Structure formats: structure tokens, C-alpha cells
Amino acid sequence: MGTEKEEPDCQKQFQAAVSVIQNLPKNGSYRPSYEEMLRFYSYYKQATAGPCLVPRPGFWDPIGRYKWDAWNSLGKMSREEAMSAYITEMKLVAQKVIDTVPLGEVAEDMFGYFEPLYQVIPDMPRPPETFLRRVTGWQEPAVNRDVQAAPEPSHPPKEPAPPSPESRLPRDLDLEVFCDSVEQLEPELVRVPVLSPVPAESELPHLHTGTGDSAQRVWAEQKEAAGRELTTRSSPESPEGFGGSLMGPQELDRWLVGTVQAMQESMKDVHRRLQILESKPQPLEQQRSPRTRPWPLGLSTPTLLFFILWPFVVQWLFRQFRTQRR
């Protein structure tokens, strides 16, 4: 009986945690690490698809290998255990947000995204109630409201602002798409071996890319990562120049355009220098081509003729001498 009652609660909490992560803003105050995103992905896959039975992707798919390793590391963990681990990881993330992000810098709707978790997870970490009352008009835990409805206040509390369109994910995504909870992280993960690990530019809701677009972006990022060391000297600004964090799509496009322009200028400069070197007059010694020597041993023409003709001259003189003696 206890198990039958526990499974629906665990699944309900799991679905609520998935919904919260799916709705987190991309440009929020908290940026999860790569390890956290991979853990969320692995727990989700284990909870929805079971143990990893698919073969490991090839070397040409580094993102798939990262995700496969994270999923495969869970072994034969049951789906209920994976859901529980997912919820536990969600609690750790919520506590980390409370501990690391100053409450004075948190947007008013920041903790509004976690409100569904407060309704189904009683021990979900939450900020001080005074802060919740001040920024969101939150009065009491939603669990108590389910038991006993609270009276309406004299003035309606301030509703949490809905996420902006640019930070909100498409709602037509099915749950299976969300299982790849590091889809939007793929360009950043490709750069992990090249750049030092820094907080990701995008937040956890990174599921709006399809399989084809994801593969194209991975291939483009692989080429960009392979040529980064070659273009660093000629690049107008390196990736580390953007505030010490990874670049967003627009910043990456601007940086790539600048890099290509710098490379083109470098190639033009090299070509111009080569033309200048080719057009310079060569020194006299180099201009004077080595003179062909038709005569052997470097002998002059008269000397060579003398060596050729002297036997005949001697023979003729000898004959003249003999003729005169007779």
C-alpha cells in the first residue's frame, strides 16, 4: 500500500520538477554548470527510458558521447530511484540559488517559477518568507492552501510576472524533447576541451532545438573549435573578451564575422607582400644568368683552336722539312 501511494507522489513531484526546469528563463540570475545539466539529463533519461541500452555515439558526435556517458553511468538504476534523484538534484539547485544569488539582485518573478514545486514537495528549499511576501506577494505554502483556503487579501497580491517571450520555451514541445535537457548547451559543451569551464550562457531550458538543427550546430561548432587556435592571433577579439563567460548566439556570430574579416585582411596582406617581393628588381648577380660554357674546361676559343690545330701544323711543318731535305 505504501509503495502504491508513494509512486504517484514521486511521479507528480518529478513532473513538477521537469516543468520548472523547462520554464526557467534563459537569461536568469542563476546559471547552472555543465555537470548539473548532465545530471538532470541522465536522471531524466533513466526515469523515462530506463537503463542505457543504445550504443555509444561515434567520435564525430562529442555531445552525444557526453550525454551517453552521463546516462550510462547510472547503470541499472530503477525509474523510481531516477525520479527521486532528479527531485533531490532539483532541491540542491534551489538551495544553491538561495545561497549563491543575492536576494537583492533576484528578479521579482525568479521564485515564481519554483512555486509548483512548493505545492507538491513539502521540504523544497525556499527563501525567507519575508522576501517572498515582499517581491511576489506569496502568503503561505501552497500545501496549506490545499488543506484550508486562505481568505482573499484586501488587495490582490502581485502575481508573478510571466516569463518573457524570448526567455520562454515553445509550449508545443512534448516531454520526449525535454529529455535532452542539454540540447541548447551543445555549442558550449563542444568548447569545454578548448575553453576553461565557466558558467553557461544559457540556462537549463535548452530544449527547443530539433535533431537536425542540433547536428548542424554541433558540426559548425566543431569546425569553429578546431580553427580557434589558428585564428586567435588574427581575431579582433577572443571569446574570453566577453565578460569572462561563454558567448551567446549573437555574440558568437559577431565574433566569427570579425575573425573571418581579420583572416581575410591577413591573407590580403600576405598576398600584397608576396607581390612586392616578386616585383622588386633582383640583384645584378641574380639577374645575370649563369653563362653557358660551350667549351670544356673553361678554355677560350683561341686556346681550344690551338690545341686542336697544332698537331696538323706540326705535321705540315714536318712534311715541309722533309721535302726540302730531299
UniProtKB/Swiss-Prot annotation:
GO terms for cellular component: cytoplasm. Disulfide bonds: none annotated. It comes from Rattus norvegicus. Keywords: Lipid-binding, Phosphoprotein. This is Acyl-CoA-binding domain-containing protein 4. Residues 147-170, 223-248 are annotated as: Disordered. GO terms for molecular function: fatty-acyl-CoA binding. GO terms for biological process: fatty acid metabolic process. SUPFAM superfamilies: Acyl-CoA binding protein. It holds the Pfam family ACBP. It comes from the Eukaryota. The keyword Secreted does not apply. Residues 10-99 form the ACB domain. The modification Phosphoserine is found at S164. The keyword Phosphoprotein applies. Binds medium- and long-chain acyl-CoA esters and may function as an intracellular carrier of acyl-CoA esters. An acyl-CoA binds at residues 21-30, 41-45, 67, 86. Gene3D superfamilies: 1.20.80.10.
